[in-house]
Design a protein with these regions (language model features):
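Short, charged interaction patches at domain edges and termini
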Residues: 1-15, 42-50, 89-130
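Short amphipathic alpha-helical segments
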Residues: 53-55
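Extracellular/virion structural assembly segments
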Residues: 43, 62-79
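Small/polar-rich, solvent-exposed N-terminal microdomains that initiate assembly or binding
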Residues: 1-47, 69, 81, 85-86
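Broad hydrophobic/π-residue packing in well-ordered secondary structure
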Residues: 22, 60-64, 110, 116
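Short hydrophobic/aromatic beta-strand micro-patches
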Residues: 40, 58-60
Length: 130
């Protein structure tokens, strides 16, 4: 039987960004490189063959200015990639952009985050009865 399932949106966003910034999906590795962007899925909705995902991009760098610039680049790349219909991604809207100050994982780093709505097509997979 064929069924429709949601994509791994964190990995799709990582693939869209990886040629332009250092990017990770959750969980952040213990010895992560900086500056970097972490992609986290926070929620979403599904309607027919379309999924709308809420994701958070967290840019970590030595200074607030570097973190904000990295986040702006990541958001610009993601927007360009979704306009180009990269992979399974179809559309993205930045909902909020904020500076959080120090990174809770590594307090020596600064953290800037953005919440983004990403639209993607669901994928069809074949499953067998058990």
């Amino acid at each position: 039987m064929n069924i429709e399932v949601s994509i791994d949106v964190e990995d799709e966003v990582r693939l869209a960004l990886k040629d332009y910034v250092t990017v990770y999906c959750r969980p952040l590795p213990e010895n992560f490189l900086t500056p970097c962007v972490l992609v986290e899925q926070m929620g979403g909705t599904s309607s027919n063959t379309i999924d709308n995902f809420v994701i958070r991009l967290g840019a970590r760098a030595a200074t607030d200015a570097e973190a904000l610039q990295l986040l702006r680049v990541a958001l610009g790349v993601l927007e360009a990639q979704t306009k180009a219909q990269f992979g399974k991604l179809r559309y993205s809207i930045t909902n909020s952009l904020a500076s959080w100050g120090s990174d809770p994982v590594r307090p020596d780093l600064k953290l800037c985050t953005a919440t983004v709505l990403v639209t993607a097509h669901r994928e069809t997979i074949a499953i067998s009865e058990s």
